[in-house]
């Protein structure tokens, strides 16, 4: 199935799986989704992910979700920039999520990264979504 917004699809799959206390969830594979998952893994919001190749030639990403005391680690995950309304931020205007307790995930010229990494690299970009 084709999707017009793969990032929103990924976020929705993660949110729905955590509401049902699933340990794993799969999503169609792409390089952008893998880069987003790498940021979530490095920030400690998911346990990990793996690329699974099917005999038909398509790949899927299998995501291991993370829980703490039976509660999902990701409390809120919200899409900011959408295909119909892109949201960009310079390095000076990068949003802080819940006073720095959460992160914003950005697409920058240097790749997909968390907001604090973008501040360190002194780059702005498209604010994809926020996580708390």
From Swiss-Prot:
One of its GO terms (biological process) is translation. Keywords: Ribonucleoprotein, Ribosomal protein, RNA-binding, rRNA-binding. GO terms for molecular function: rRNA binding; structural constituent of ribosome. One of its GO terms (cellular component) is ribosome. The keyword Ribonucleoprotein applies. It comes from the Bacteria. One of the primary rRNA binding proteins, it binds directly to 16S rRNA central domain where it helps coordinate assembly of the platform of the 30S subunit. Part of the 30S ribosomal subunit. Contacts proteins S5 and S12. Belongs to the universal ribosomal protein uS8 family. This is Small ribosomal subunit protein uS8. The lineage of its organism: Bacteria, Pseudomonadati, Pseudomonadota, Alphaproteobacteria, Hyphomicrobiales.
């Amino acid at each position: 199935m084709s999707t017009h917004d793969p990032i929103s699809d990924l976020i929705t799959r993660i949110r729905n799986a955590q509401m049902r206390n699933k340990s794993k969830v799969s999503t169609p594979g792409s390089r952008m989704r893998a880069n987003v998952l790498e940021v979530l893994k490095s920030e400690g919001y998911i346990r990990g992910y793996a690329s699974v190749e099917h005999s038909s030639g398509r790949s899927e990403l299998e995501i291991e979700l993370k829980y703490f005391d039976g509660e999902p680690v990701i409390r809120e995950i919200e899409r900011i920039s959408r295909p119909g309304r892109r949201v960009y931020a310079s390095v000076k205007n990068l949003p802080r999520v819940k006073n720095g307790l959460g992160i914003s995930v950005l697409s920058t010229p240097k790749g997909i990264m968390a907001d604090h990494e973008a501040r360190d690299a002194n780059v702005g970009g498209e604010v994809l979504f926020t996580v708390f």
